[in-house]
Amino acid sequence: MNPAQILLTNDDGIQSPGLWTAASALSDLGFVNVVAPRDQFSGAGRSLPIYSDGLIDQQKMEVDGRDWNVYAVGGTPAQAVLHAIFEILPEKPILTVAGINYGENLGTGVTVSGTVGAALESATHGIPALAISLETKREYHLSYSPEVDFSTAGFFAAYFGRKLLEKTLPSDVCVLKVDVPCEATPDTPWEITRLSRKIYYHPTPPDRDSWDQPGIPSYEVVGDPLQD
């Protein structure tokens, strides 16, 4: 019997240590197909921009002594999901996992997340999806910093991935979104909650003196992860 096909993607890009922690953690659950954006696409949401080139680069990577065939896609996380479903995987996956993301996805800004966007795109095709993120310091959000320990988040990726394989989500739920606190351990209890309607990532204006200078809006963290 062929192993279950699991799709793994992210928004931080194919080289992200968080992605590879998830790949190793999920490997006991089925055959993990790693199909992720070639580039950093944090903040892409569920966008499907027409200017993406859609190029697919099959690569070989060694992680934890194991060789992986992986696919770097010239597109957003949601587009990576579509390429995986339409062109790459031999059959429709039974589970999609997006992550592990550098930085928590909370509050009203959750729809900006490419991690969540990939999970939502999967769900529209009837594939159960898990989006998982790890709380980190602000300066690590767009990095591949080795200072971040993803091991506990990897444990919960496998834990909740197994739950989704064993049980179906309620009919009114399309995505399971998990945020792992930075100080959590595998023994940390978890609970089901709801998203706050308050701003967690507060947009800030471009840092420039005139419009002919390059600049884009940024953000600062103003919320509390435990805020109601």
Tell me what each language-model feature is.
Residues 84-90, 117-128:
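Alpha-helix C-terminal capping segments
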Residues 12-20, 210-211:
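Short acidic, Gly/Ser-rich segments with clustered Asp/Glu that frequently serve as metal-coordination loops
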Residues 144, 148-228:
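Electrostatically charged, flexible surface regions
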Residues 123-145:
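Glycine-rich phosphate/pyrophosphate-binding loops
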Residues 33-35, 71, 97, 128-132, ...:
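Hydrophobic/aromatic beta-strand patches that form the interior of the parallel beta-sheet core
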Residues 104-113:
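Glycine/threonine-rich flexible loop motifs
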Residues 2-6, 20-87, 91-92:
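A cross-family phosphate/adenosyl-ligand binding-site feature
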Residues 94-103:
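Short acidic, glycine-rich surface-loop motifs adjacent to enzyme active sites
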